[in-house]
C-alpha cells in the first residue's frame, strides 16, 4: 500500500454555494446517529425493565430522552471530527468526494467549532445523569475521533476491530445512564453490538473495496483478500449468535426471544457460508450488509419488547 495515500490532502475548492442546515446534518452522518440513539434507547430500556421501575413516571422518560440526545450529540461530534480529519481520503472516494467537508463548502474552522459545540452539549447532558455515563461518552469520543480515525484507520488492518470498541458504546451508555454502574446485562448488550460491527463493516469493505484501496485505507478485504474476510465474518457471526443466546441468563426474557435470536443468527450464518460459493462478491456483500441491519434492528426490538411484556406479566 502507498503510505502517502492515507495522508491528509488539501480538499477541493468549494463551488461558492452557501452553507445550509442540510450540509451540517449530513456532516454529522445522521444514519449513524439515528442507529446509535436507538441503541442507547435499547440500553436504557433494558436497565429500566431490569430495575423493575416500570412505574417510574415522567422522570424516567426525561432521563431516557437526555441519555438518547446526549449520546447522539457526542457521537455526532466524533463523526464531525472524523470527517474533518478524513477530508483528504474522502476526496479520493466517489461516494464521499462531494461532501461539504471535502469541497470546502464548510470550512475547516467551522467544522471544528461545530464538532466542539456538539460534543460539549452532549457531555453536559450525559454528566447530568451520572459521572460514569459522561466518562463512557468521553472514552467513546476519544477512541473513535482520535485513536481510530487518526491512527488505525490509516495504518492498520485492525481498524475495524478497534473502531468497534467506541462503536458499541451507545447501549452501554444508555444502560449506565439509569443504573450508574456496569453489570452483566450491560456487558452483554455491549458485546452484542461489538461483535455485530466487524461483519457489518467488512460487508461494506468488500463492496467498496476499490474505493477504499484508492483512498489508501488498509481494510481487511484489501490486505488479506475477500476469502480471508469471509472467514472472519463467519467467525464473528458465530460468536455473536452464541452471545445473543446468553441473554436469558441475565435478562428476564421469554423463550420467544431465544428462538428469535437463534433464527436471526442462523440466517446470518447461512448467508455467511453461502458467500464462499458466491459468483459475485459485490452482490453478496450488498445482501450481507442489508441483512446485518435487519438482524441488529430486529434483535434489539424483540429484546426490548419481550423484556417489557415479561415485566408487565410479572405485575
UniProtKB/Swiss-Prot annotation:
<keyword id="KW-1003">Cell membrane</keyword>
<comment type="similarity">
    <text>Belongs to the UbiA prenyltransferase family. Protoheme IX farnesyltransferase subfamily.</text>
</comment>
<feature type="transmembrane region" description="Helical">
    <location>
        <begin position="30"/>
        <end position="50"/>
    </location>
</feature>
<comment type="subunit">
    <text>Interacts with CtaA.</text>
</comment>
<protein>
    <recommendedName>
        <fullName>Protoheme IX farnesyltransferase 1</fullName>
        <ecNumber>2.5.1.141</ecNumber>
    </recommendedName>
</protein>
<feature type="transmembrane region" description="Helical">
    <location>
        <begin position="132"/>
        <end position="152"/>
    </location>
</feature>
<dbReference type="Pfam" id="PF01040">
    <property type="entry name" value="UbiA"/>
</dbReference>
<comment type="function">
    <text>Converts heme B (protoheme IX) to heme O by substitution of the vinyl group on carbon 2 of heme B porphyrin ring with a hydroxyethyl farnesyl side group.</text>
</comment>
<feature type="transmembrane region" description="Helical">
    <location>
        <begin position="56"/>
        <end position="76"/>
    </location>
</feature>
<dbReference type="GO" id="GO:0005886">
    <property type="term" value="C:plasma membrane"/>
</dbReference>
<dbReference type="InterPro" id="IPR030470">
    <property type="entry name" value="UbiA_prenylTrfase_CS"/>
</dbReference>
<feature type="transmembrane region" description="Helical">
    <location>
        <begin position="106"/>
        <end position="126"/>
    </location>
</feature>
<dbReference type="InterPro" id="IPR044878">
    <property type="entry name" value="UbiA_sf"/>
</dbReference>
<dbReference type="GO" id="GO:0048034">
    <property type="term" value="P:heme O biosynthetic process"/>
</dbReference>
<keyword id="KW-0808">Transferase</keyword>
<keyword id="KW-1133">Transmembrane helix</keyword>
<feature type="transmembrane region" description="Helical">
    <location>
        <begin position="162"/>
        <end position="182"/>
    </location>
</feature>
<dbReference type="InterPro" id="IPR006369">
    <property type="entry name" value="Protohaem_IX_farnesylTrfase"/>
</dbReference>
<keyword id="KW-0472">Membrane</keyword>
<keyword id="KW-0812">Transmembrane</keyword>
<dbReference type="GO" id="GO:0008495">
    <property type="term" value="F:protoheme IX farnesyltransferase activity"/>
</dbReference>
<keyword id="KW-0350">Heme biosynthesis</keyword>
<comment type="pathway">
    <text>Porphyrin-containing compound metabolism; heme O biosynthesis; heme O from protoheme: step 1/1.</text>
</comment>
<dbReference type="InterPro" id="IPR000537">
    <property type="entry name" value="UbiA_prenyltransferase"/>
</dbReference>
<feature type="transmembrane region" description="Helical">
    <location>
        <begin position="186"/>
        <end position="206"/>
    </location>
</feature>
<feature type="transmembrane region" description="Helical">
    <location>
        <begin position="249"/>
        <end position="269"/>
    </location>
</feature>
<feature type="transmembrane region" description="Helical">
    <location>
        <begin position="289"/>
        <end position="309"/>
    </location>
</feature>
